From Swiss-Prot:
Top-level taxon of the source organism: Eukaryota
Sequence similarity: Belongs to the peptidase M16 family.
Keywords, in A-Z order: Hydrolase, Metal-binding, Metalloprotease, Protease, Zinc
Cofactor: Zn(2+)
Protein name: Insulin-degrading enzyme-like 2
Single GO MF annotation: metal ion binding
Length: 966
């Protein structure tokens, strides 16, 4: 069952680097004179270059009283350097040359990374290197970026994941850095330091000087050139980083003592729902990464097949999700965590659930560590490693740079993802640590509101704490239901045939292989990636699916129940590298399958059979209805920018319903309603299919023929063809030309201080030349938007400009979320930005214009890196009905012909302030501290503008763009 390892190494200065045997890239490890360790990657096929620098210092090293300083430094290094002193010029250069840039700060690391078009790599790499050689951290920029860090923190305040993570840290040893608040805010970076006579900027520079040393940095450079040329480049640019011979900071000891164990913590979340999180401090797996003890145990405790813990909880109606594995690990400590999403009934049976969890751990203890289970895990991981899809260079570089300080050179690429050494004693040691003596239990529920007596200081999470003993847990185990908990059975979905089909057809675009009154099949053989994988999409077009709020909700529950019924079976396929999903689509529901092609058809047939034999089980209906209800209710707690985006979609999209109406409909629906609805839903159906990858023509046709045989041509068919008039498509509201439209709404979460604006400009219906002009505007204006509105004006951490494509109608969206300014003010600043851009465009030189066009062409010609990326593009063309599979070439051709004057005319006509053919929509969502501004903002609306008071009425009054799907 194991996959061979031949041709799976690459040369390195420190021995061989294990690499996937299908990987043609070259690798080389070097160490510069300043002790900077570097991995060079040469990929002649790439059209993006990338780099990632991992610095082995993070928030654990923050000085006392300056919480968040490491994170703040990460922000500051982006600003400027002595060699490139213009503020934000690094980000501007990267963006204008088709790239992206980002960074993150973790407990013990800070990682900086970027990607860019290949012909701009040298200068980008030079600018990047200056972060670590001579950065400028000006006084003015310091205060502005403290505000940005604070804005980031404000966005996290109402996030349950951030709140619970900090609560777990809060309830740990105060003398361990795990206990710290890590992200920083205005209080920790400005107010308190100032009160204590501490200059934050001086401390920032001191922190940089003390900790940013070349010998604790690890660099990955991913280039197109050969290794020798890339090595010369790296030696020239990065040799200037100082080496102060710092040791990598170490933080020995577990964050939890006996005082922090055997505790039950009840906490009040923001969102509706109940969650149980059970955590044990354990021996870090990183020291035994080839034996993978936590991966082994996580796969068993988190298994979802029959006989598993989750299956038992699901049958009892107590849980809707269970996740197990290692979390919050370092070289010195680690936690093993089991998280269970509870139903309302499960919340009432928390003790029984914990009893069953410890009963399952007891089953594992009694069964011993199994060789065959480890061998299955190893076989799956080996197949996934050796046949992994290529990912974007920036993600690849980040993954490897973070691995370099942890693993020996040989395992830099694979990390801990390839268990290969069966050692029962090591697994047993961690299993023994999953004991009642060693446990921390965190129980979240809104039902605890008003029942807590403590508050976590950074996120104001209400909680209570009580001690429990091992005897308490033993009582829970004894009183738990008597269910048959078992180890999983062997996984029949593990692929064993990795051969590539002899695909005689070399079509570069999808071809229409088959069409009947029941279905249409688009087929695209793999001519690029040569992996034993396939990609399948099937859109079941059912006109009834979204015909009303009731129908939309019933369709949603139908899809949820299908997934629920298939879960025990399909879980094995997903564990073996065969992803599958069912979801609602614009006019029905969609099936997705992707992964190893060997046993894909087996899963496909199981899904189709479940659709054909669908029946409503009242007990499962009740559980799913409860889950869906909470999901709708939690829309209230979306971030303001998400609310604004949803309102924008409601204005524009012809066939979507407000979530409030769907929630109201849901409350009245019962199992009988769904039982009556599903046969009607499926009674008229058309299946749009796309099959790509390592699949032969006759195989693809056979799959679709099987669907037709089961659903359409059986002696008692479930589905019949659509009537010609039933081929519905989603159409888009056409905004009034030369008109500004405004929609004002109070934020749905009264506790959220943030406000948000979506400033949408609708431009045109899909057309190559117009698309290219709009894309060029977005490329040039994107960085100016970020620099002006976020960096200079500090309106909000979430600030973006992006293209929008609503069913083939193109436009641009400015999205800003702010705790400091209201939407009316932000909207005026967007218009001011557009005036600044107008001046910039008019004064742009021909050379600069040509450079921007060239950069956009390079971006558009970037090759798909894997089968999934290629398939997403083609499937979008099929779904929207445009079928312009040659879109990239056509839009590039339009760009090559584009003149500067022609492009400026486009801007003048459709985008600039008061453009004659401009169609704009401002969605204003007001947080609680800006509510008083809403009335005044409404009063300021010009008489030539339109305030949308009722979205549905407005939508009915407007014309619709014609559908592209004919």
């Amino acid at each position: 069952m194991a996959v061979g390892m031949e041709n799976a190494t690459a040369s390195g200065e420190c021995g061989e680097i294990l690499k996937p045997r299908t990987d043609k890239r070259e690798y080389r490890r070097i160490v510069l004179k300043n002790s900077l360790e570097v991995l060079l990657i040469s990929d002649p096929e790439t059209d993006k270059c990338a780099a990632s620098m991992n610095v082995s210092v993070g928030s654990f090293t923050d000085p006392e009283g300056l919480e968040g300083l490491a994170h703040f430094l990460e922000h500051m290094l982006f600003y400027a350097s002595e060699k490139y002193p213009e503020e934000d010029s690094y980000s501007k250069y990267i963006t204008e040359h088709g790239g992206s840039t980002n960074a993150y700060t973790s407990s013990e690391d800070t990682n900086y990374h970027f990607d860019i078009n290949t012909d701009s790599f040298y200068e980008a790499l030079d600018r990047f290197a200056q972060f670590f050689i001579q950065p400028l951290m000006s006084t003015d920029a310091t205060m502005r970026e403290i505000k940005a860090v604070d804005s980031e923190h404000q966005n996290n305040l109402l996030s349950d994941s951030w709140r619970m993570a900090q609560l777990q840290k809060h309830l740990s040893r105060e003398d361990h850095p795990y206990h710290k608040f890590s992200t920083g805010n205005m209080d920790t970076l400005h107010v308190r330091p100032e009160e204590n006579g501490v200059d934050t900027r001086s401390e920032l520079i001191k922190f940089y000087d003390e900790h940013y040393s070349a010998n604790i940095m690890h660099l990955v450079v991913y280039g197109k050139e050969n290794l020798d040329k890339t090595q010369g480049l790296v030696e020239a640019l990065f040799q200037g980083i100082r080496n102060t011979n710092q040791g990598i900071p170490r933080f020995p000891g577990q964050p939890c003592t006996l005082d922090h164990l055997q505790v039950l913590v009840k906490a009040v979340p923001i969102m509706q729902g109940h969650e149980l999180s059970v955590s044990w401090p354990v021996t870090p797996s990183i020291s035994h990464y080839e034996e993978a003890p936590c991966r082994y145990l996580g796969d068993l405790i988190g298994h979802e097949g029959e006989g598993s813990l989750f299956h038992a909880l699901k049958i009892l109606g107590w849980a809707t999700g269970l996740y197990a594995g290692e979390a919050d690990w370092s070289m010195e400590y680690s936690f093993f965590n089991v998280s269970i999403d509870l139903t309302d009934a499960g919340h009432e049976h928390m003790q029984d659930i914990l009893g069953l969890l410890f009963e399952y751990i007891k089953v594992l203890q009694q069964s011993g560590v199994s060789q065959w289970i480890f061998d299955e895990l190893s076989a799956i991981c080996e197949a996934e490693f050796h046949y992994q899809a290529k990912i974007d260079p920036i993600s690849y570089a980040v993954d490897i740079s973070s691995n370099m300080k942890i693993y020996p050179t040989k395992h830099w690429l694979v990390g801990s993802s390839l268990p290969s050494k069966f050692n029962p004693a090591i697994v047993q040691k961690v299993l023994d640590e999953l004991s009642p003596n060693n446990v921390r239990i965190f129980w979240e529920s809104n039902k605890f509101e008003g029942q807590t007596d403590k508050v976590e200081p950074w996120y104001n999470t209400a909680y209570s704490l009580e001690k429990i003993t091992k005897f308490t847990i033993q009582e829970w185990m004894q009183s738990a239901p008597d269910v048959n908990l078992l180890l999983p059975t062997p996984n029949v979905f593990i692929p064993t045939d990795f051969s590539l089909k002899d695909l005689k057809d070399k079509d570069i675009f999808p071809v229409l292989l088959r069409k009947t009154s029941y279905s249409r099949l688009w087929y695209k053989p793999d001519t690029k990636f040569f992996k034993p994988k396939a990609y399948v999409k099937m859109d079941f077009n059912c006109p009834l699916a979204v015909s009303s709020p009731d129908a939309a909700v019933l369709s949603d529950i139908f899809v949820w129940l299908l997934v629920d019924y298939l879960n025990e079976y399909a879980y094995y396929a997903q564990a073996a590298g065969l992803d599958y999903g069912l979801s609602l689509s614009d006019n029905g529901f969609e099936l997705s399958l992707a992964g190893f092609n060997h046993k894909l058809r087996i899963l496909l047939e199981a899904v189709i059979q479940k659709i054909a034999k669908f029946e409503v089980k009242p007990d499962r209906f009740s559980v799913i209805k409860e889950t869906v209800t909470k999901a709708y209710q939690n829309n209230k707690f979306q971030q303001p920018h998400e609310q604004a985006t949803n309102y924008c979609s409601l204005v524009l999209q012809d066939q979507i319903w407000p979530w409030t109406e769907e929630l109201d409909a849901l409350s009245h629906l019962e199992a009988e309603d769904l039982a009556n609805f599903v046969p009607m839903l499926l009674s008229r159906t058309f299946v749009e299919c796309y099959i790509a990858g390592n699949v032969e023509k006759d195989e693809a046709e056979s799959m679709v023929k099987h669907i037709e045989d089961v659903l359409f041509t059986d002696s008692k068919p479930i589905c019949r063809p659509l009537f010609p008039s039933q081929f519905l498509t989603n159409r888009v509201t056409e905004l009034g030309t030369g008109m500004k439209h405004f929609y004002y709404q109070e934020g749905s979460n009264s506790s959220d201080e943030n406000s948000a604006l979506v400033h949408y400009i609708q431009v045109h219906k899909d057309e190559f030349s117009m698309n290219s002009k709009l894309q060029l505007f977005e490329l040039i204006a994107k960085q100016d938007t970020f620099h002006q509105l976020r960096t200079i004006e500090q309106l909000g951490y979430i600030t973006s400009l992006s293209l929008s494509n609503d069913s083939g109608v193109y436009g641009v969206q400015f999205i800003i979320q702010s705790s400091v300014k209201g939407p009316g003010h932000i909207d005026s600043r967007v218009e001011s930005l557009l005036k600044d851009l107008e001046s910039k465009f008019y004064n742009m030189s021909d050379e600069e214009f040509k450079s921007n066009v060239t950069n956009l062409i390079d971006m558009k010609l970037e090759k798909d890196k894997n089968l999934d990326e290629e398939s997403w593009f083609y499937w979008a063309e099929i779904q929207t009905g445009t079928l312009k599979f040659n879109r990239i070439d056509a839009e590039v051709a339009a760009l090559r012909l584009l003149k500067k004057d022609e492009w400026i005319d486009f801007f003048d006509e459709y985008i600039k302030v008061d453009a004659p053919n401009k169609k704009s929509l401002s969605i204003c969502v007001y947080g609680n501290q800006h509510l008083k501004e809403m009335r005044n903002d409404k009063d300021k609306i010009p008489s030539t503008s339109i305030e949308i008071e009722d979205i549905v009425c407005f939508r009915k009054s407007q014309p619709l763009y014609g559908s592209l799907k004919l």
